[in-house]
């Protein structure tokens, strides 16, 4: 998946990275490279947490089954 992120230099010199498409998905780094690495981890964690939340919201009688789909 492709996400757009914003990078902004904070007053303390750190680079703040945010993914506007994912509310609250923000990270930072000492430089642009580290900020981008960290926001990738934050996006992965955000998506995992959202997946867990969605799965927990399913009715228990829904019968969740994992499947593999090639894209």
Pin down the residues of each PLM region.
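Short aromatic-glycine-(Arg/Gly/Cys) micro-motifs in beta-strand/loop hairpins
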Residues: 8-22
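Functionally engaged cysteine thiol sites
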Residues: 19, 25, 46
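Short, charged, surface-exposed hinge/linker loops at domain edges
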Residues: 1-4, 10, 33, 37-71
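A short, exposed loop/beta-hairpin motif centered on an aromatic-Gly-Thr core
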Residues: 23-32
